[in-house]
């Protein structure tokens, strides 16, 4: 895994790389978690923190309605919107698919961790309590405010996986 995870994570963190390559790297990391989650454990905390950072920095809140005006604060001009189809080499990290990929990775990592704990693995969780609190806050914010509906739903699912992992770690798996 030393040959795979660090270079892929370096691509994800590099803002000079096109968003499509960053998403592909996240997808490959998710496949690593899905294929053999024990192998990714040495990197789990760094990856989780990195993806929470990415989600926090690259979140794109929906336009709000100005008080008393009844219309959005956006002027309705969508010329600045860039899609991956029209510009596949875009480095715009605010695109929803990048957030979706990060949320998918986090969900898989949390689900795999929950399964390992339920199997009675001697695995010690690399996730400190502060990371759970931060992840919960970021996922709640994204699920409530993101401009993209799919991202909001995926954030809710990731938050549910986080809740299940916390419950399992506390021995409440039968209640979750």
Report the location of each language-model feature.
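Hydrophobic residues within the alpha-helices of tandem HEAT/HEAT-like
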Residues: 11-12, 25-36, 51-55, 71-74, ...
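Alpha-solenoid repeat scaffolds
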Residues: 15-19, 39-40, 58-61, 116, ...
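Positions within the helices of HEAT/ARM-like alpha-solenoid repeats
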Residues: 17-22, 62-63, 94, 98, ...
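Extended alpha-helical scaffold domains
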Residues: 28, 32, 36-39, 43-47, ...
């Amino acid at each position: 895994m030393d040959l795979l995870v660090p270079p892929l994570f370096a691509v994800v963190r590099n803002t000079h790389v096109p968003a499509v390559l960053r998403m592909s790297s996240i997808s490959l990391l998710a496949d690593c978690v899905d294929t053999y989650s024990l192998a990714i454990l040495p990197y789990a905390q760094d990856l989780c923190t990195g993806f929470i950072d990415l989600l926090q920095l690259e979140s794109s809140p929906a336009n709000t309605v100005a008080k008393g005006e009844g219309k959005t604060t956006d002027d309705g001009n969508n010329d600045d919107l860039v899609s991956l189809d029209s510009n596949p080499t875009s480095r715009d990290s605010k695109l929803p698919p990048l957030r979706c990929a990060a949320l998918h990775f986090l969900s898989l990592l949390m689900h795999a961790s929950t399964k390992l704990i339920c199997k009675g693995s001697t695995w010690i969780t690399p996730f400190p309590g502060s990371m759970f609190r931060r992840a919960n806050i970021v996922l709640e914010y994204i699920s409530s405010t993101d401009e993209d509906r799919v991202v909001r739903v995926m954030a809710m699912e990731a938050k549910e996986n986080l809740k299940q992992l916390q419950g399992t770690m506390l021995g409440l798996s039968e209640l979750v």
